[in-house]
Amino acid sequence: MEGYLASVSLGEESTQMWSLNKRLEAYLSRVKALEEENELLRKEIHSLRSSKSERCWKKKHHEEMMKLRDALDDGHREMVQAEMVRDSIYEEIEFVKQRCLEEKQAREDAKKELSESKKLLEEETRAQIWLKERLGQLEAELEDILRDHEEEKALMEEEIASFSQRLENFRVAPVAFKPVEVDDYARKLSEIWQGAVEEYKSEVSVLEAGLSESKENLRKVLEENKQNRLLLQSLDKELVSLKMRKEALEDLLSKQWQEQKEEEEKLQRKAEALEQEKQDLRGQIAEVLEDRQQLMHLKMSLSLEVATYRSLLEAESTRIYTDYRGSYTFNDSMLEHNNVRRRQSEDTRKTVSKDHRQSYSKKQIGDKNELQRPSLNNFSTVKSSAVPVRTSPVTKEFQKVSSVLQSQGLKYTKAPQVKEVQTVSTVKSNLETHTFSGDAFRRAQVETRKTDEQVIKKDALGLNDLNKNTGFKEEKDIQKPGFMDHVVSKSVSSTEHKVPEIDPLESALKSLEEDLSSVSSTFNAGQSSNLEAIKDVLGEPICLENLQNEIAFEKESPGTNAAADPIEEVISESVSYQTVHFEKQELSNLLEIENTHENHVQDATQAFNSCEQDGHDRASTLENNEPDVQQYIRTLESNEIKESKIPSDNTEEAEIISKSRKVFLENEYIPVSKDDLTEFTSHLENDSESSQSFDSKLFENKSTEDQLITNLKSNTQENIFQSNQEHLENLEFDSVVPDTVKFMYPQENNLLEEENVYGDGELVQMATDENIINQSSDQLLLSDHSHHEETKTSESIAVEHNRMESEHAEVDKSSEIPVEISENVSVEEIIHEISDVEEDTKQAFEDERVGEQINQNNQESTVDLDGSVYSQEENSQLEEDEVSISEQIEKDFEINEQECLKSDQIREAFDTEEVDHQVVDFMQEQSFEREVGQLNNIKQEVDYLQNYDEDSFQNNDEPQELESCDLQEQKIKLEEENQLSENEGNQNFGGNDIEEFSQQGYDTDEICQETIGNQVSAQLLCESDINQDKLSMEDEEEQNNPETEDNIGLEQESDQENTRSNEGTKFSQEECDVVFKPEDMSDKSEYSGQQEDLDKQVTDFSLNEQANNDLLEKEEVILHHADDQRSVNDEITIDEKLSERIIDNELATVDVNESLAANKEQVDLFTDEYAVDDNVGMQDDDSGQYQTKEDLFVDGNNIIEKIEIQQTSLLNQEICERVDNVDEDISGEAKNESVEMNDVVDLVPEAKVTGDEQISPLQDEKLNLETMEDTKDNDGQLCLEKENETEYIEVTDSPQFATDLSHDAGRELTVDQNSANLQFCENPTKTLIAHHIEYETVADSDLESTEEQVQETERIPFKPEDSKMENENSESEESVDSQEISLNSHKSEEFEISKDYQLEQTLPDVTPLPNLEDEFEDLTEQPDVHEEHQNNDDSGASTFITSVDEDKEREVRESVSKDEESNEEEFGDVLSVDKTSQVEVTTLSGLAQEPSYLGDNEESEDSMENAEILNENPSNDIVDFMVSQMTETKIIIAEQVTEQTEVTLQFDDAPNKLTENLNAREKETYDYESNEENIEFTNENQSASPANDIVDENQSEDSVISDNEGTTSSYEDLPNATSISHVVALEESNISTTEQSSTDTKRMTYEGYEITSLQNVEDNAQETEKEFPSGVPLGQEDSRSEDEELDDEGSEFSFGVNDEKANGEHKDVGEDDETEDMLNGHSQTGYSKIVLTSKKALRWKRMF
């Protein structure tokens, strides 16, 4: 292109210019026509706007519209109400649905329970049917057995008859046989027989031991195998589950690993794609940069062509002006500018008339030239070593054109060269780039220097004539370089990022240093001369006719021009070949700022051109016009100087900037205060109304621009200037007047002050630095017009300085809270800032794309259109871009401002929350002590109310009302105190804190009130909960005592007082010390009347207490830490008190029992003398203690025979009457809801023993001895019998149970008194003081010392089993001595029954008791005392064996048979007792039936008696003995077979039914206990069935073996061993048959009582005898050893139960629940098992 331009001659170009001018003329005329049309349209629009008639329709419809709005509001309100109603109905429907679901679920549960009950009923029915069938079978078996028995008996009688004949024949033998030899043989045979028996016994014992050991080992092995099998199964399941889990985890791990691999591959592919895209984009960018560079070169060449066209156009301007002067088609743009500058000061018209719009086309061209001039200066300082220094062909071409124009008399200043360029910083900023460069002064100077002084002088002579021409020329000279600069700047701006290897920061610094050095050197020459030169330079393009400017031109030396030309040439050449790389953000910012300033220049130019017609006033208004133009130019220069400020991390650069600006300001300018500026502006406003309007419009536009620029700056430079903050703080801000910036930018400082609040003063310092930098242009203007106010400047500066300090102080105060907030920057805010940066980057890309489109459009328009058309379209495009960019800037600013506000709110929220916590903690600490005091008062009042409630049981509602009222009063008090505490807490805070909370919208009073209220309510409820816990624990303590609600007594009344613990301690001491006196009996009748009232009070109290607890539980309990600790401490204290009371009771009972054992040891020494004391009555004192006093002495044996028949008949009649009464009472009680164990005392009828029936001392002696022996046999448990009822009383397992025997002989005590006093026997912990009775308890393992003492005392009258073989003679003697005592005690036995029956009903049972029916036992077979503690199988102590003459015995039995027949019918009544009552049926197995507890050593007492008699008469009475033995055997067999009338529930197929409702531990315990009973009482007709068949066989075997041993040991010394062995075999057969039948039919259950008839028992006995004809069933040989091995385990379980009993740790069981449990046989208070027997068994005894 350059070569083409060089080849084309100037003549051809002239021809082309003429044709172009013609086209331009047509274009301008078209523009004029369009302007006229626009003016008409504008007037029409104005007229339409002025008319207000069209708006009247609003008033017409306003009222209607308001009505409609009201109707709409009403409809909306109704809709809201309907929605509320709908929501409430929906909630109600949901509630009803929930209730329906609950009811449905309850119905389903009821159906399930009904089905289960039906199933249970069917099972019970089937069981009953089976039992009936079984009963029939057993009856048939019993008949068979009886038939076989008759046959066997006949055979035995025949054998006995034959044997007696043989004996008679043997006695008649010849005398040849010597008696001595016979005796020797008999003795030898007996020895041989004895040795064989001993050897057999030893072998059997060894085999039994081995077998038992083997069975035990087998059992253990089986158990271990079972456990191991279960363990193996559990481990297998666990292994399977672990394997499955392992597989699942492995699958999950593999899946996650695969997903991770896939994700990594996906990310790798994405990274590769992005890398490839990056490479592609780099290539595309390189191509685009290269294209842009080429376009830049093309643009430069085109700009040269346009310059050429402009010069030609100027040459023809004179002709065009003269030809078309009348129509003003072509007006001189220079003259227009001059007119505009004058118009700026005059401005007599607000709007430009239509006549003056003909120059719009040239004005528009001039505007575009002005817009295009300075943009290239932004990049002019960039240099590169690759650019050649030689002169380019373009420069040569311009030189040629310049020479041509000079020859024609026109001065063309210079080719468009790039002079000094202000660079744009690489930092993120929106303010660095402005269109006008900082070298405006030098450019004006260069242009002025190139003017010929001589020509100017000549033109000065004809100033008025030549002003327009010369002004036009000079304007063109200024505009041409500007246009070229603009074109070059566009091309450079589009391609500047192509050279990344050049550091823009370094180039910018270099250019800035050169610029500053040149400016400073220019003004250092002299202040006055420089000011005049600058004014001349600025004024020259406007009015050349000014003589001052001509003089200034003459003063300028032409040498500077020559020096500046080479430099400018080099700079222009370097710019033409070089680009600068900037970041994408800077490119977008550059385009925005450039368009903004172009818009301002356009507005200013339009304003200037509007004054074109005021040329005749140019001279007069020059002084007023020139300062305004200079003001505007200097404003633009200040913007350029702002651009030159480079924020960077390099402190040296900042020092260079500050240093250069400070020197520049100090040497050349004087600071001006705000007052001066206001006076100056007022002066300008007073000039004219039009000038004021123009200035306001100009400043308004400028302020809008500055606001947008400042907003951009605040968004982009906030983080960049932090690094330079410390350095910028060192700048002397006070020496500069910041109001000059306010004058030019009236809104900038306000915005900066607002930003200072959020940015900690950074932007204030930044703005200050900018003010320092911009002083050069602003103060240059103000210094010319404020020289008359210089005296006021220093004062105004001081005043302004003080004002700024106060403002900064206020800003600092106001920014205290934001500073605190800014310190707590969270991660979310950082992420938010990062997202903002990303959005800004995206916006920058979009702006860059818009700029590229603009550049492309500009290039296309440049190629296709002429110069004038290109300028016009470019200007319009720039205006549109400017509008779009300004809108985008405003949007960005609003978004950033909103984000800043959000972040500030978040920070304030965080700080507010922290302060809230501090406030709450502080208020809590202030009010905690007062709250504690109030809560203590509340606690005391609540305790008082509770005590008051306990004193008034019958008024249930009054305590609740009082308590609720007190609680409400306390709540009101607490609310008042909370308010006071809140006020005090608020006073402790500073005023700033309260204001801060109030400003942030938090109600501190409400927060504190809610917090303290919650704490107070929590502590209040905590205290009430503690009181409730205390009450519940006290109730548990009361109910843990095994006394019923009907027999609470004075103890519970004392527990209701506040001094419960002290009185409880005294009461526990009284339990061991108080002894009941007979004279106190009268008080007990009154106490029984008080008992019913007390029961009602207890019920009322429980209801009242429950209501109080419910009242306290209504509110939510929020426990404070201190309250939790307090409640725990209270509970611990209560537990300690309870444990102390229990320990005191136990220690007291231990002491009492030790004394009892010592006393008993002394009394046992008098056994041989028949002096024994017995407890014949038990009474209850004020504390419920038991005490019996009966001192009876034995004088002889003669009176026994006289009294026994009479006493027996009387007692039998009395007992028969009692049985009827008992049946009636039991049937009546069965109709009630429930009857508890302790309430059965009411069933006992009162029977008095009249004076005629008083017991004689001798009879009492036998009775006492009998009772003592019974007590021994029962391990310390008293056995009380009637004739037809036998009760088994089981006292507590603690050693508190005893009976006290005093030495007051002959004490008479009636049964009536006994029954009255025994009603209060309710607490098992109360003791029966029995100092002289031997007993054993399975109670507490802690009382072993007492038990050992008891055992030692028991060794005195009894011999252990181990030594029985050695001490047979002594044992036999003791047995003979006790025979008469045992028989005589039968007569007085019935008297015991009435007393003991009542005692049994009042004492709860803990361990199962055996039956007390058997009459016979051998003392020699008593187990060892040590074994009695270890094995309950051996726990029974044998009774004394009695023996009288056979005649006496027959008489006694005949009387008994009569009584049996009279009482036969009563047996059925006893068996028909309802299940719901606690049934007690007894049996009496003989006239003088003696309670005995037979263990494994059971045998017939009759056989033992006969053995003892035979032992006394070994040689004379053998025949009589055999006859009596046979008769006795028949009676024994019949008696033992038929006595089995008990309530049983036998299931052969389900032997373990007994324990189905028990847990594992209880099951084992109860099974073992049932086994014990079966072993101990096999000859009795009531006992529990074993847990399995093996145990039954073992029990039977043990009994047979023990009987064999006992019989053998009794008959060892008889002379005729054969006859004795035969009798023993018969007895073994009978006993084993009876034992087996008893074992098979025994079944006692905890689930209820099923009654079977006597026939069932008989059938069972017959069936058993058939199965085991030999009398010794298999599998019974090793039961004793096995039972002994199981003994420790059973004892341990028994101790555990007893310990629970002693400690009172029992669950609270209601009346109904306790009754139901008792009926099921497993009550939680541990009552003993009640077995039903009957007197009817005696009837079967006499059938044979």
UniProtKB/Swiss-Prot annotation:
Residues 8-48 are annotated as: Coil 1A. Keywords: Coiled coil, Intermediate filament. Residues 341-372, 785-816, 976-996, 1032-1093, 1340-1470, 1485-1506, 1560-1722 are annotated as: Disordered. GO terms for cellular component: intermediate filament. Residues 61-156 are annotated as: Coil 1B. Residues 980-990, 1433-1442, 1576-1586, 1597-1621, 1629-1639 have a biased composition (Polar residues). Residues 157-179 are annotated as: Linker 12. Residues 315-1744 are annotated as: Tail. SMART domains: Filament (SM01391). InterPro entries: IF_conserved, IF_rod_dom, Nestin. The keyword Coiled coil applies. Residues 200-314 are annotated as: Coil 2B. Residues 49-60 are annotated as: Linker 1. GO terms for biological process: positive regulation of intermediate filament depolymerization. Residues 194-199 are annotated as: Linker 2. Residues 1-12 are annotated as: Head. Residues 1034-1056, 1340-1351, 1368-1377, 1412-1421, 1496-1505, 1680-1691 have a biased composition (Acidic residues). Growth cones of embryonic vertebrate neurons. Residues 180-193 are annotated as: Coil 2A. One of its GO terms (molecular function) is CCR5 chemokine receptor binding. Belongs to the intermediate filament family. This is Tanabin. It comes from Xenopus laevis (African clawed frog).
